[in-house]
């Protein structure tokens, strides 16, 4: 599958309920320190979905995709639909990078159902869906031309 660069922010730390120090470390690109900070927060407040989201984002930017995925999966269990939507969006982005397109599309769609006004999710969903449809059309065209030979 051809790669499509989608220029949107991976995660926006605009949650008013997120931890200031973690956001500051993240924004300063001190991802390892942010990871440690969020781990400490989660030891004190297990199940803190905002901290899981912060941990996931910090881990992602620190190239620790496994930790990022686990953290986003935990955050996706939140009762808060905005956090849940952001977590699903981030999982979808990771799966998209792994070429798990069908799973990614399903998660983008679910994130949009939770937060229909999320422009980044809407853009990624539509672009990925278009890319998948174009690829399917190209495959059908190739099969048709091979049959004619």
Protein language model regions, located:
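Short, charge-rich amphipathic alpha-helical segments embedded
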Residues: 40-62, 115
